[in-house]
């Protein structure tokens, strides 16, 4: 099964998960980056991301290459910002026009996921959502996170 992992990660947690899934499933990886990505303090990131969620801003992305029709399974992962999936995924989904595909979703968070997965699924309407997962601080969680990622990814490969 040809698989793609699409990920946006600001602090590295979602990239950590995506890299593990890529390795386990021999998948292609597409890393999304905003055009104005900058190093900010933790509070600066909180304000920047929370502001985008609050005001419904879809940030511009750096160019990426992805052809949905080339894949049987598309796995997407983003951090949770203000109880929602990070806005860069909205920009991506608007442009990529993914429809009728098998989709698996994951989010990374620091302790509160809110309705992020519910909102993420709504953004992917018109697709078959086959799995979802949330990973709490996967980099800090070490072996426990690695086991959770492995178990989830293996379930996708069936």
What are these regions (language model features)?
Residues 1-76, 83-85, 90, 94, ...:
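N-terminal beta1-alpha1-beta2 submodule of the flavodoxin-like/Rossmannoid cofactor-binding fold
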Residues 26-28, 128-131:
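Conserved beta-strand segments of alpha/beta enzyme cores
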Residues 71-72, 100-101, 127:
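Short, well-ordered alpha-helix to beta-strand connector turns
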Residues 76-77, 105:
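Redox-cofactor binding/interface segments in oxidoreductases and associated redox assembly factors
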Residues 94-100, 124-125:
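Short, conserved loop/helix-junction motifs that constitute active-site signature segments
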Residues 107-112:
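Short beta-alpha junction loops
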Residues 116-125:
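Short, aromatic/basic amphipathic alpha-helical patches
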Residues 130-158:
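Glycine-rich phosphate/pyrophosphate-binding loop and the adjoining helix
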